[in-house]
Amino acid sequence: MTDRHHLLVHGATFAVVGDQGDISGVRGGGSPDGLFVRDARHLSRWQLTVDGAVPEVLTPVADGDAARCVLVPRGGRQEPPAHTLFREQAVGDGSFVESLRMTSNRPVPITVRIALTADADFTDQFELRSDHRTYAKTGAVRTRQVLDDGLEFGYRRGEWRSCTTITADPAPDAVEETGTGARRLVWTLELEPHGTAELVLRVMARPHGDKRALRVPRSPAAVRDHVLALEGGFFEGVAFPTGWPELAAACARGLTDLASLQVPATGPDGEELRVPAGGAPWFLTLLGRDALLASLFALPYRPQLAAATLPALAATQAKGESRSPLAQPGKIVHEVRHGELAHFGQVPYGRYYGSVDATPLFLVLLGAYVERTGDALLAWRLERHARAAIGWMLDHGGLTSRGYLVYRADEGGLANQNWKDSPGAICCADGSRPSGAVMAAGAQGYAYDALRRTAWLARTVWGDETYAALLEQAAADLRDRFQRDFWMPERSFPALALDGEGRRVDALASDAGHLLWSGLLDKEYGEVVGRRLLEPDFFSGWGVRTLASGQPAYHPLSYHRGSVWPHDNALITLGLARYGLHDEARTVAHALVDAATAAGHRLPEVLAGYGRDTHPEPVPCPHACVRESRSAAAPLALLTAVGGA
């Protein structure tokens, strides 16, 4: 986000507004504004004028759960403003509500004309990205209908139907055409001397297929009360560290964000669930890997996230090969999209299985959840899903045929299918990309942990000793192979990946820290790796870089080739603690907490890789999610790893 854009989030709904609360309807660029629900823009213009002019911003919108600003008519120092407009906005579930309070500053009656230009273009989020792609929409029709107390925008394309309804209290005096698809709602307010008048506008988005009976909140204050109640329940029982107030504040901020970043999902029996979304603005939907890691980080404090995430992912687990070759039996979904382009197959992400690591992470979380909570009932309920996930790992995943979990670039989808999924993220030190199949190091660590944890479930919950022994042997064999094939003795470090010919992809990357978290490396190798990650080419002062500097492939602003990811560092910190490297774990934890403190105690999705010694403030990465569930949960992982030290 730029300093002119502000994000409001509630579940699967978010809005991006400017300093004065307006929505401009921009397309392309880093952060289009609007009201978004289920991948579609349900408000594309929302622009206020007073007496025909755009008011001046006295106090701009500030980031928070509601957008508030103070506006006045433009004028000079010799003529104080005739009135002041107090504007407040908030988002609810599928809704947007605004309060406009106009106060006269004059001792005589005045008349003020307020106009609000509104439009809904129903653009899919994928159309708004700055990748210059275009999508045909043959037969698409947009409609506008004036209501007694507002108006309704509609959109249809084949069987696809969406609408946005705007109502106002009091009703507008007129609804005017603008010469475009937008409409202008107009009120003429008669204000008594120093009097006040208030307008309340409510927007209800009805995306395709949403049959829920939703109610628009009566006011932004009602949304605020609901959010406070939600956050209060989310905080209950969490013991924040008293000796480290900055970590306590980061944990509190993270829990607040996790509370707002939960989106609806459905379990195997049709039960309604709420699970962590990927992040806003671009990924406010179920992402398998992201939901699993956020739930893992929060597990000691908020196990209900895992209790919802696991059934939701079981319900979307692939049951057979479909038109997508990636939907193989037992595989856990990578991404679920609800938008128009996904519905018509114009993007592959409606239910997309392009992740090599979501499946083992599903098993890791299931084992960790049962071990932590003692809730064996969930393990019984999801037994067939867990066995199917193991089956995928051994069969389509490649453990039996290749010895490792393996993926291949998906034409039209993701070239890389581990957590570093941007093009070119898996590379050699010189920047060249591997050819053929890819066996990413971090995914092998997850597979090892998944095999061991599922063996424990088989023995202690399912009573299947034979299956447990089989999985334990598979884990031991994987560990032996990995240290033989991935370890680079000349660099005393594991390779980032193996290519299709089994050659080592030799970039020095942060993924090695995930092997510590999984426990895949022998203690001697693990200690070497852990200390290496704290050397200056890796450690920026704000965290461990995704790629060590000094390599030709390094770029401090690259998404995955030199940046610093909080969730990546949270896993590294947990791994350092696991291998007894407590000083190193505290160093990384303090760096991340300092980065959070510099940004209002909120960790972003990703930071630039610039060193703290050359730039004393953390630098944000362009196009990153402002709020992201893994980053929100990362302070909780730090608390687990190092306590309040």
Please report, for each region that a protein language model flagged, where it lies by residue.
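An extended acidic
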Residues: 1-82, 94, 107, 121-122, ...
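Acidic/polar, glycine-enriched structural segments that form the non-catalytic walls/loops
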Residues: 84, 92-95, 104-285, 376-380, ...
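Short, solvent-exposed loop/edge-beta patches enriched in aromatic
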Residues: 92-94, 105-108, 193-195, 286-308, ...
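Helix-terminus loop motifs that line ligand-binding clefts
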Residues: 269, 302-380, 387-401, 406-409, ...
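C-terminal capping/lid segments that line or modulate ligand- or cofactor-binding pockets
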Residues: 282-286, 337-372, 487-536, 558-645
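Extended ligand-binding clefts on enzyme/binding-domain cores
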Residues: 380, 387-444, 483-548
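Extended amphipathic alpha-helical segments enriched in small hydrophobics
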Residues: 440-464, 469-479, 563-599
